């Protein structure tokens, strides 16, 4: 039997072994700065790369990031609120953001739903004093009356309390700018006012929340106003946040 060469052993690889390069080594890191109404000025970091004529800082403008309010406020009780921040300007390695929406987590919404009660929802489109057009969604649930034994449904005539809910939301939003309005969302100022009204109104309510806020239209970018919103920010390290779609 003739002994020949084993081609599988003698054959070498073309080009040799390639050098492994870390893809993040060529990227720039930017600190995402949340407005100072949150307890953590630095809410996360974002990496981006400059390639050819494409500048990394230009690619960050108008990006929308989503972060849990619990991370911004250092308060786990606020974990059910999701805040959207939009990048408005890039200064050096800092990305200055502004409020761009709010929503509830799915598990929080499901936990509010109970048997033997009515869900009442209302929404309005309003314009703030600084010309932000926003859409506010409110939810509330009927509360059991003392003389009721089991269920506490609101009849069709009593569902008209939506009109009063809209009136309160419009009144609170039209008399302040975006910064002041966002400050009302976290302590649930509008929801508490609706609860106070319902004690004198048609039907008792419970679990009244502003569950969602959408920015429909923003005014023309003004750097001076953005700096007024941010003021002086510190270098506190924040939590990672993920990018969200700008739609919805």
Swiss-Prot record:
Q: Where in the cell is it found?
A: Cytoplasm
GO CC annotations, alphabetized: cytosolic small ribosomal subunit
Keywords from the UniProt entry: Cytoplasm, Ribonucleoprotein, Ribosomal protein
Q: Name one Pfam family in it.
A: Ribosomal_S3Ae
Matching SMART domains, A to Z?
Ribosomal_S3Ae (SM01397)
Q: Where mainly located?
A: cytoplasm
**Quaternary structure per UniProt?**
Component of the small ribosomal subunit. Mature ribosomes consist of a small (40S) and a large (60S) subunit. The 40S subunit contains about 33 different proteins and 1 molecule of RNA (18S). The 60S subunit contains about 49 different proteins and 3 molecules of RNA (25S, 5.8S and 5S).
What is the protein name for this chain?
A: Small ribosomal subunit protein eS1
């Amino acid at each position: 039997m003739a002994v020949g060469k084993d081609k599988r052993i003698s054959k070498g690889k073309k080009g040799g072994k390639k050098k492994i390069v870390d893809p993040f080594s060529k990227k720039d890191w930017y600190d995402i700065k949340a407005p100072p109404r949150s307890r953590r000025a630095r809410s996360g970091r974002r990496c981006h790369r400059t390639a050819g004529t494409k500048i990394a800082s230009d690619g960050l403008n108008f990006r929308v990031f989503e972060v849990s309010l619990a991370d911004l406020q250092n308060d786990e009780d606020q974990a059910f609120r999701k805040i959207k921040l939009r990048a408005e300007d890039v200064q050096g390695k800092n990305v200055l953001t502004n409020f761009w929406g709010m929503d509830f987590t799915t598990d929080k919404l499901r936990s509010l739903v109970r048997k033997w009660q009515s869900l009442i929802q209302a929404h309005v489109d309003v314009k703030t004093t600084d010309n932000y057009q926003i859409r506010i969604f409110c939810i509330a649930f009927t509360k059991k009356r003392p003389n009721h034994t089991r269920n506490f449904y609101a009849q069709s005539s009593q569902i008209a309390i939506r009109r009063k809910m809209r009136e309160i939301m419009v009144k609170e939003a039209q008399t302040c700018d975006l910064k002041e309005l966002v400050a009302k969302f976290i302590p649930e100022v509008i929801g508490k006012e609706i609860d106070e009204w319902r004690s004198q109104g048609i039907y008792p309510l419970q679990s009244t929340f502003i569950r969602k806020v959408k920015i429909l239209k923003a005014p023309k970018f003004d750097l001076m106003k953005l700096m007024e919103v941010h003021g002086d920010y510190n270098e506190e390290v924040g939590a990672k946040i993920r990018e969200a779609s700008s739609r919805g």
